[in-house]
């Protein structure tokens, strides 16, 4: 409740309803973080998954989001290194079996937005994901997960992510869309199948 003095004395202003996210989760710090896909090429579903103690947090992402994230992580880490030249280099070497997604694969939501940040005092990268909502939904209510991980963990995620993406259907060099074995309709070629 808010009360304020007006010309006629005390005026009551009802509280404003402030939209809140459905939930916010901090995985801080991640014991392990990875991305992977389940399914056959052309029908795969992509995930980011992290563990902390006994907790497993999984979200669904798009293939293009994983590819962009992998590129963005490398660019982001290059900036962090440039601004902090005394930091040891983050390794990107990974073991495939360790990077595979693990059950339970029970995603909390489909990701709409992805962001990166860096806490210099803790030398941790935060991977921020926000729930994808429909246009009718209040965007302020989107659920949020923040994955706090070491630079090495995030670099391994990025390099493994590139590998996961590359195992799918080849990408058309003209339009950037996935190609099917029987070809695809390329907008750059006026829709002709090639």
Residue ranges and their predicted role:
Residues 21, 33-34, 123, 169, ...:
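Surface-exposed peri-terminal alpha-helical interaction modules
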